Amino acid sequence: MHEYIIQGGFPVNGTIKASGNKNAALPCIAAAILSEEPIILKNIPEIEDVFVMLQVFEALGGHYEKIEKNVFKLQIEKVKTSKIPEDLATKIRASILFAGPLLARTGKAVLPPPGGDVIGRRRLDTHFLALTELGARVETDQNFSFIAHKLMGEDIFLDEASVTATENAIMAASLAEGTTIISNAASEPHVQELCKMLNKMGAKISGVGSNILTIEGVKKLNGTEHRIGPDYMEIGSFIGLAAVTRGQLKITDVEPRDMRPLRVAFGKLGIGWSLEGTTLTVPDKQKMQVNCDLGGMIPKIDDAPWPGFPPDLTSIMTVIATQVEGTVLIHEKMFESRMFFVDKLIGMGARITLCDPHRAVISGPSSLHGSELVSPDVRAGMAMVIAACCARGESIIRNVYQIERGYEHLVERLKSIGVKIELKEK
């Protein structure tokens, strides 16, 4: 077990490169099941979740090798089993992403209930709906078993714009017979990334970036090389870190289009940045002040499917709001347990009223003090790191495995921009 020891109160300064998008890397790894040929993935973040997905890929009969930093070669000439090992499935929710590819390649997929962050009720019904529409039969006992003699294209309307259910449907439909239309599809950048990779492999997917996808099934998918785009969730986290520590930070390898929803939400808290090409600069000593809605109403920051504000950043925004002059409502619509970490911020000196499991009213600025904290999930854990960096004194954060599931070489990279952080073995 490891823990972070952070001395707060120091501004960040310098340049940091954005890592590859974790939420794009995971489905792209699963999609390698769809071809017998080699897949080379570049800009893959070297984080816990990626390595667990690679272990699942290997357990199914695949082989992978690290060619160089952040570049991996994957190949699975023959699938030796269609069952995900239970010990790996329980480590990561994204193991569900192997259902569609296994079903398309072998006609069967057996998955133990997936693990991952405990941030509320995370239903799997939309996955079942999509795959059964394509011709699969679902059996449930201790595991979820998907069986299909032949997948057939279908007109599918998803009951929610689930990212992973959309990705499963896309992968299964790519090798199905006939044409599939997916309505109410998720359109997040990582879904677009998967579609781009599959099209390079020979898939025929149109409507990429919209909520209606058309997929013409093909008989075979080929190998390819694909570079994963930058992680806008990580970029948003670093913007927040710079703002609350009053430092100047340059973030390189940014995709400007991904930043538009973030600019709107951060702007409500008086936080801005400049973009020059793919380099984003957060200026120091910004006047962080809540911009009230018309009529002087308290502004609301709420999450929504893309191109709305991403739910993975609501924890980060909650911490930022504690350092902004004024009052704001944070409304986490999607996950009812994500806001429960705010009691730790209150213990550090934040003024927060938790209205219900989905909503919190934050008034600032508050002077935070160091504390002992336990990371409940990857995003709340990073929010705690940001809180510790702007707090007075020393903070200790435990269960940092959760944070390192989503943030690459975090301690090393934070040190490079001036954060007083140490990794200690407990």
From Swiss-Prot:
GO terms for biological process: cell division; cell wall organization; peptidoglycan biosynthetic process; regulation of cell shape; UDP-N-acetylgalactosamine biosynthetic process. It holds the Pfam family EPSP_synthase. One of its GO terms (molecular function) is UDP-N-acetylglucosamine 1-carboxyvinyltransferase activity. Its EC number is 2.5.1.7. Its main location: cytoplasm. The active site is at residue 117. It is found in: Cytoplasm. InterPro entries: Enolpyruvate_Tfrase_dom, Enolpyruvate_Tfrase_sf, MurA_subfamily, RNA3'P_cycl/enolpyr_Trfase_a/b, UDP_GlcNAc_COvinyl_MurA. It catalyses: phosphoenolpyruvate + UDP-N-acetyl-alpha-D-glucosamine = UDP-N-acetyl-3-O-(1-carboxyvinyl)-alpha-D-glucosamine + phosphate. SUPFAM superfamilies: EPT/RTPC-like (SSF55205). UDP-N-acetyl-alpha-D-glucosamine binds at residues 93, 312, 334. Disulfide bonds: none annotated. The keyword Cell cycle applies. Pathway: Cell wall biogenesis; peptidoglycan biosynthesis. Belongs to the EPSP synthase family. MurA subfamily. This is UDP-N-acetylglucosamine 1-carboxyvinyltransferase. It comes from Treponema denticola (strain ATCC 35405 / DSM 14222 / CIP 103919 / JCM 8153 / KCTC 15104). The gene is murA.
